[in-house]
Amino acid sequence: MERRRDRGGEGQKEQVVRREGLMSNERLTRPQLILSLYLCFGASLSTKLMDRLAKHRANFSPHDKYLLLNHLDKLASKSKLIVDSIFRPLYRFKAAMILRSQRLISVTAALDPSAYCETPVYNPDLCPNMIAAQAKLVYHLNKYYNEKCQSRKAAISKTIREVCKVVSDVLKEVEVQEPRFISSLSEMDNRFEGLEVISPTEFEVVLYLNQMGVFNFVDDGSLPGCAVLKLSDGRKRSMSLWVEFITASGYLSARKIRSRFQTLVAQAVDKCSYRDVVKMVADTSEVKLRIRDRYVVQITPAFKCTGIWPRSAAHWPLPHIPWPGPNRVAEVKAEGFNLLSKECYSLNGKQSSAESDAWVLQFAEAENRLLLGGCRKKCLSVLKALRDRHLELPGQPLNNYHMKTLVSYECEKHPRESDWDENCLGDRLNGILLQLISCLQCRRCPHYFLPNLDLFQGKPHSALENAAKQTWRLAREILTNPKSLEKL
């Protein structure tokens, strides 16, 4: 949802973005008490509470409070250990929580939004086992990272080298046929520029094109997540390196370039030295290669845009959120963005002529820059490993990019660097998993820089519902039994 208002007489508009499906940065930004209750009593909570949970309303009626207290009392009766595990990641409330005979007598004050404190404070007086439980979770997460995540990284690195050998050979053949498509796939600091890991068996290689200079970048917001390239002057048409791909209206067509590139790659596959192990993926307008019947690589022509920032992302960073700092913002915007020749669809699922000519915005380098420092990348690595092992579901509702997006939102909700110390890894992971459940229930996951773009668009509702249930089971297991990470 967005609200716009005119500022003065200049016609400038201020965009205020409200990210539905994500917790807004209001006074009570994280009602983790209710979310944690949901992890243990998801099916038994009332429909009304479920609705409130999905909408993240900060204020609750007396009846809601009664239901919550009743469930808390039942929970305390069942197990003091579970109570400790639930209250461990919560933030300080000005509350009197008394554990007597393994029963929770009163937590009414814990539901008071005015008592919320943004900074996590671990007070042994509130819950004696809280610090020990947190340390235990961090210990098992670090063990999981060192054993599972590092082995995953090593395996993927080996796969990337194998895949890039094949792709490089194919692109060399393309370049021989058409010198305008020059291979930009190169290794730098043990990573390949322009390569993105979608999953351990799926990759995307961005092929950067030259000479975008005679085109203007037009980003009017009519196509969420997309923009067009229009000739700056009709008289410059013949000066463009890509003259045959310019439409009658003066737009550089992403579809036409992709179609030409697909033809070239198909010819190159038949001529390259790896022709016995690589073949084109049929029934798609995208350029995809299947290598050794195990890996799929999408090769996408693109323009790299530096020194400018899209108008559809002009609201970022949000003025009331202190993260990231001015220096980091400058670095991120200096990284710029890419314009990818990929398919983009409107809400009705059909591609219009305007969309076929449009280019998809991508912020890969800017997003990587945001996640520098603290345990951010470690947290993302754990999430990716958990996704690969437990959330690779029918309909493919979740991918690594969803996890990356939620880590960025978590950084906004916890802007201080101290919030990302190694000893906070458990809290951050727990918060992101809870947020993922919320997004799946709401069937909406806004793009971090382009909140009008829903990353769940086109995903089957049944697949999202199934993913929400599986994520709930996973989060509950980690929350109540950190040692279970040894088997996850």
What are these regions (language model features)?
Residues 2-10, 17-203, 207-263, 267-270:
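N-terminal regions immediately upstream of nucleotidyltransferase
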Residues 333-377, 387-488:
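Pol beta-like nucleotidyltransferase catalytic core
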Residues 27, 298, 308, 484-488:
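Membrane-interface soluble catalytic domains
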Residues 40, 117, 127, 149, ...:
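Generic recognition of cysteine residues
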Residues 7, 15-20, 70, 299, ...:
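Composition-driven detection of intrinsically disordered, low-complexity segments
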Residues 154-201, 209-359, 369, 375-389, ...:
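Conserved catalytic core of two-metal-ion nucleotidyltransferases
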